[in-house]
From Swiss-Prot:
PTMs per UniProt: Phosphorylated on serines and threonines by host kinases, including human casein kinase II.
Annotated source species: Influenza A virus (strain A/Port Chalmers/1/1973 H3N2)
GO molecular function, one term: endonuclease activity
Annotated EC: 3.1.-.-
Cofactor binding, note field: Binds 2 manganese ions per subunit.
Protein name (Swiss-Prot/TrEMBL): Polymerase acidic protein
Protein encoded by which gene: PA
A Pfam family it matches: Flu_PA
Quaternary structure note: Influenza RNA polymerase is composed of three subunits: PB1, PB2 and PA. Interacts (via C-terminus) with PB1 (via N-terminus).
Transport keyword on record: no
Biological function: Plays an essential role in viral RNA transcription and replication by forming the heterotrimeric polymerase complex together with PB1 and PB2 subunits. The complex transcribes viral mRNAs by using a unique mechanism called cap-snatching. It consists in the hijacking and cleavage of host capped pre-mRNAs. These short capped RNAs are then used as primers for viral mRNAs. The PB2 subunit is responsible for the binding of the 5' cap of cellular pre-mRNAs which are subsequently cleaved after 10-13 nucleotides by the PA subunit that carries the endonuclease activity.
Motif, Nuclear localization signal 1 (NLS1): chain positions: 124-139
Binding site for Mn(2+) 1: H41, D108, E119, I120
Record GO biological process: cap snatching; DNA-templated transcription; symbiont-mediated suppression of host gene expression; symbiont-mediated suppression of host mRNA transcription via inhibition of RNA polymerase II activity; viral RNA genome replication; viral translational frameshifting
Keywords attached to this entry: Cap snatching, Endonuclease, Eukaryotic host gene expression shutoff by virus, Eukaryotic host transcription shutoff by virus, Host cytoplasm, Host gene expression shutoff by virus, Host nucleus, Host-virus interaction, Hydrolase, Inhibition of host RNA polymerase II by virus, Manganese, Metal-binding, Nuclease, Phosphoprotein
Length: 716
């Protein structure tokens, strides 16, 4: 078909058709029938206009090309074949000079004699069906429609055919010739059917009776019958101008497209209020580990055994006391809960055989901390129908919080390297295909860059805690089970290491639905003094529980050891996703891989090795108030991983909403940077949608602040 088109049509027509297909992202090598259809339509538009002029008296005359009077005014302005921007410029100019109403869709011609736009149609089907589709799409009495078919039929608005019979006969003859030439080459059947794809069951199967009535009843408003709606859908052009598309959708929609310029966007407004607080399920940069190297004790691998062994490595325990109370809680209960944990661990050690699990005594302090008997009684709705003032209980609007510097510090820390290895290289058999070889090479390079990263530690810690808590919630539903918070890693020298961060005590956990909540109390070791950033620890009661000797360059020094205690809650679905935090590694690897692919396609060879081994090259990491931050490929890997991990740790409806809405603004800004001249409508509504997600979540507030930095530097 492509060869036929190039032989059959004028090279100028072919070139214009190629440009049109490129503009709409279509491949003429694949869409060959469409290529032929565009060329045919262009040629008919040119033939419609050819030889038609207006003389000094304003009459329409037909003049051959070699006639000396060819300088007369052309009767028709050709709009089809121009690029969209130029075509709309011509249409606007005509409307301004003639007073014609601006069409919603680009027409093909303008007739200066009749003062009207013309839409030309060339169809391989019945002319009246195609005419109906065009009329339904355009919905304008000011645009004249003229349809030609390959069988010599034609149809025009009000049977007004505009041209003289000889000019129309020339067009019909040309279309018939094209059909014959296609048929001779065996191309016609495919071309004829491609206008609406292959023949469908609906075309052969008449809908009647009840189904027909149901179809007519199910139509959207403003459609009287199924045929009208079908014609409208078939004539709906996805790449038409936006205003036209909107007006097609509903008569009530009247969007004015505003140009989006460098001066258009304003910064996102962050909320005012007290500073935001830490809301992760476990401590991040402030966590302290009690560790044992090369564990070989009896029961190694059983969490309770490992925890007791780690506790024995510390000798600086002292009488605990509260250094930062929780403003709304009964703080002595938190203190008593920690003392109870110490006492019950001591009881275990005195036993002959250490049990595999430990259920805490149901003391008053634990009952309070775990919300035992605090839930309102559930009553069957049927028993309440007669209560006159039955209503849902009032809930307060969340208090707005401002961005605080601690969350940026947390993120920076998550990107850093630790002195331990948190993930192993997977043992995989021999590669059998080149693609597997490249994939495993990329994975190995990536693993080497992130295996020491603190964000990877958070992944392993999160996986362990969520797995242990979900298991205990199912296995010991009524018990207050003590769950050690443990992780495992290797030292740089390859020695195994078991770490204890603290303990969790689980409350009652009859979790029937995914969203049913299990309460727990977390008790985590730390060297961070909470009085330095009290706002960060709003939800915590912090105890001082010991003194730790630390080795430094100037010798040994003693630092107070703190215990961060809080009541928290989670659900089956949250624990299920927490158990799958390793997915963060995969997500960030895929992002790195897309960067490698982009580089490889430019260089036309796989660039994996160069990408990771060229240590001198820097890559953009993100935006800050200083501008675009750059770093090594390893830093890029760790930053992408940290972002993915924080999306998991701080998952919330606020984050979902902000990500979805800010992405729309981001795409418009990127279109502006790419000189695509974007337009917007209701930009204020988009800002409103973004800003209603900025309430109190620290990670969302930080992302909004980063977005503002991006706006500042992107639009310079």
């Amino acid at each position: 078909m492509e060869d036929f088109v190039r032989q059959c049509f004028n090279p100028m027509v072919v070139e214009l058709a190629e440009k049109a297909m490129k503009e709409y992202g279509e491949d003429l090598k694949i869409e060959t029938n469409k290529f032929a259809a565009i060329c045919t339509h262009l040629e008919v538009c040119f033939m419609y206009s050819d030889f038609h002029f207006i003389n000094e008296q304003g009459e329409s005359i037909v003049v051959e090309l070699d006639d000396p009077n060819a300088l007369l005014k052309h009767r028709f302005e050709i709009i089809e074949g121009r690029d969209r921007t130029m075509a709309w410029t011509v249409v606007n100019s005509i409307c301004n000079t003639t007073g014609a109403e601006k069409p919603k869709f680009l027409p093909d011609l303008y007739d200066y004699k009749e003062n009207r736009f013309i839409e030309i149609g060339v169809t391989r089907r019945e002319v009246h069906i195609y005419y109906l589709e065009k009329a339904n799409k355009i919905k304008s009495e000011n645009t004249h429609i003229h349809i030609f078919s390959f069988t010599g039929e034609e149809m025009a608005t009000k049977a007004d055919y505009t041209l003289d019979e000889e000019s129309r006969a020339r067009i019909k003859t040309r279309l018939f010739t094209i059909r014959q030439e296609m048929a001779n080459r065996g191309l016609w059947d495919s071309f004829r059917q491609s206008e609406r794809g292959e023949e469908t069951i609906e075309e052969r199967f008449e809908i009647t009776g009840t189904m027909r009535r149901l179809a007519d009843q199910s139509l959207p408003p403003n459609f009287s019958c199924l045929e009208n709606f079908r014609a409208y859908v078939d004539g709906f052009e996805p790449n038409g101008c936006i205003e036209g598309k909107l007006s097609q959708m509903s008569k009530e929609v009247n969007a004015k497209i505003e140009p989006f310029l460098k001066t258009t966007p304003r910064p996102i407004k962050l909320p005012d209020g007290p500073p935001c607080f830490q809301r992760s399920k476990f401590l991040l940069m402030d966590a302290l580990k009690l560790s044992i190297e090369d564990p070989s004790h009896e029961g190694e691998g059983i969490p309770l055994y490992d925890a007791i062994k780690c506790m024995r490595t510390f000798f600086g325990w002292k009488e605990p006391y509260i250094v930062k109370p929780h403003e709304k809680g009964i703080n002595p209960n938190y203190l008593l809960s920690w003392k109870q944990v110490l006492a019950e661990l001591q009881d275990i050690e005195n036993e002959e055989k250490i049990p595999r699990t430990k259920n805490m005594k149901k003391t008053s302090q634990l009952k309070w901390a775990l919300g035992e008997n605090m839930a309102p009684e559930k009553v069957d709705f049927d028993n309440c129908r007669d209560i006159s003032d039955l209503r849902q209980y009032d809930s307060d609007e969340p208090e707005l919080r401002s961005l605080s510097s601690w969350i940026q510090n947390e993120f920076n820390k998550a990107c850093e390297l630790t002195d331990s290895i948190w993930i192993e290289l997977d043992e995989i058999g021999e590669d059998v295909a080149p693609i597997e070889y490249i994939a495993s090479m990329r994975r190995n390079y990536f693993t080497a860059e992130v295996s020491h990263c603190r964000a990877t530690e958070y992944i392993m810690k999160g996986v362990y805690i969520n797995t242990a808590l979900l298991n205990a919630s199912c296995a010991a539903m009524d018990d207050f089970q003590l769950i050690p918070m443990i992780s495992k890693c290797r030292t740089k020298e390859g020695r195994r290491k078991t770490n204890l961060y603290g303990f969790i005590i689980k409350g009652r956990s009859h979790l029937r639905n995914d969203t049913d909540v299990v309460n727990f109390v977390s008790m985590e070791f730390s060297l961070t003094d909470p009085r330095l950033e009290p706002h960060k620890w709003e939800k915590y009661c912090v105890l001082e529980i010991g003194d730790m000797l630390l080795r430094s360059a100037i010798g040994q020094m003693s630092r107070p050891m703190f215990l961060y205690v809080r009541t928290n809650g989670t659900s089956k679905i949250k624990m299920k996703w927490g158990m799958e935090m390793r997915r963060c590694l995969l997500q960030s690897l895929q992002q790195i891989e897309s960067m490698i692919e982009a580089e490889s396609s430019v260089k036309e060879k796989d660039m994996t090795k160069e990408f990771f081994e060229n240590k001198s090259e820097t890559w953009p990491i993100g935006e800050s108030p200083k501008g675009v931050e750059e770093g090594s490929i390893g830093k890029v890997c760790r930053t992408l991983l940290a972002k993915s991990v924080f999306n998991s740790l701080y998952a919330s409806p606020q984050l979902e909403g902000f990500s979805a809405e800010s992405r729309k603004l981001l795409l418009v800004v990127q279109a502006l940077r790419d000189n695509l001249e974007p337009g917007t409508f209701d930009l204020g509504g988009l800002y409103e949608a973004i800003e209603e997600c900025l309430i109190n979540d620290p990670w969302v507030l930080l992302n909004a602040s980063w977005f503002n930095s991006f706006l500042t530097h992107a639009l310079r």
